[in-house]
Amino acid sequence: MRAGLLYRALASLGDVRVIVVPVHAVCYEASGLCPADRLTVVDLNGAADVRADLVARVADPLERARVAALHPRPSLSEAATIEVAQSVAGLVGGAPLVLVMREYLAPYLDAVLDRHARPMCILDVDDVESTARRRSGEPAEAERYESLERHYLRRFDHILACSPTDASDLRGRYGIDAMVAPNAVNIPAPRRVSPRWDVLFVANLSYAPNVAAAHWLCHEILPLMPDATVALVGLNPSAEVYSLRAENVFVSGTVPDVEPYYATSRVVAVPLQAGGGTSIKVLEAFAHRRPVVSTTTGVRGLPITAGKHILIADEPQSFADACVRLLDDCSAGKRLSEAGYSLVQEQFAIERVTASLSGALSRLTSNRGE
């Protein structure tokens, strides 16, 4: 979704080429983002982690640990060899503007960042990864991302953050003034259909914090609502998510469109306990006029008032109680969903955010040319 927002904003300024660096085990389908002839996937086959190989050759264990600590690299940046970075630079060519999505892709732009006469380079920090990884209980990976952030953030001409909260985090830790480019969602036409599911959780179901959230929902919360049904819907469910299937738990697998599931569910749950950025899940539920129960983590960075737009609960019993309240009291759910819908219309509708971001990018490029 955020990729689509950024693509739309860039496309309003001129021709856009999309370069996909497939760092995940699964290369998600990107052809729907742009015309096929404007999309290139970088070949990472054989791109060994040279840094890790060199560190492994240091014989003394203490010296090896010291070298590894001096040159940490997040796992998703391990394929950023000199050859791969040069390949990316060749694909960039003479483009006047390069926008990189996600911190871990910054090392793949090394050969471009090192140019004397280089394009304007913008890094989109959808998550402050060091913060997100620390919340996820990954201290070693968090330290690697902190090293990456210290080394790379200032090498970019501009930084985008998805919320004022993340912008403040970057300013406080690195002295960087990031421009806020909020997440945005499409607002669908309302549909009248009979409910099928009591509680819906929509997410990328291969992402570790979402897998943990699904597990918490099904094993800790659902037993406290024995008559309720749950639908887990989203991209590429892990084996652990599939193992949650039961008589009252449905796992969809990857679907082309989540709209039918919103239309046939009564309450949306956002049971996140870790992760960063802002939750598109919450905004998407608001756009579909569905009442939402979320943890505090799930609404981080969003201008939301508990009790007005959403119900917030951080313990299994209180989360279950909030869901049951909305299932039993349709008028309470309607009040929340209408307030959430109004908020999305005013601040997070895709057309509004795209226009604002397009204007900001246009001003940045114009100022550079002066």
Predicted regions and their residues:
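Acidic donor-binding loop of glycosyltransferase active sites
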Residues: 157, 263-277, 288-291
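Conserved catalytic-core segment of nucleotide-activated headgroup transferases in glycan assembly
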Residues: 2, 8-9, 172, 180-264
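Donor nucleotide-sugar binding/catalytic pocket of nucleotide-sugar-dependent glycosyltransferases
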Residues: 120-123, 130, 150-190
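N-terminal subdomain of nucleotide-sugar transferases
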Residues: 1-43, 93
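Short hydrophobic beta-strand element within catalytic cores of glycosyltransferases
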Residues: 281-287, 291-295, 311
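Membrane-proximal helix-turn-helix segments that form the acceptor-binding/catalytic region
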Residues: 5-6, 82-92, 123, 129-130, ...
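Conserved acidic donor-binding segment of nucleotide-sugar-dependent glycosyltransferases
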Residues: 310-317, 325-331
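A short, well-ordered alpha-helix in the C-terminal region of glycosyltransferases
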Residues: 332-347, 353-358
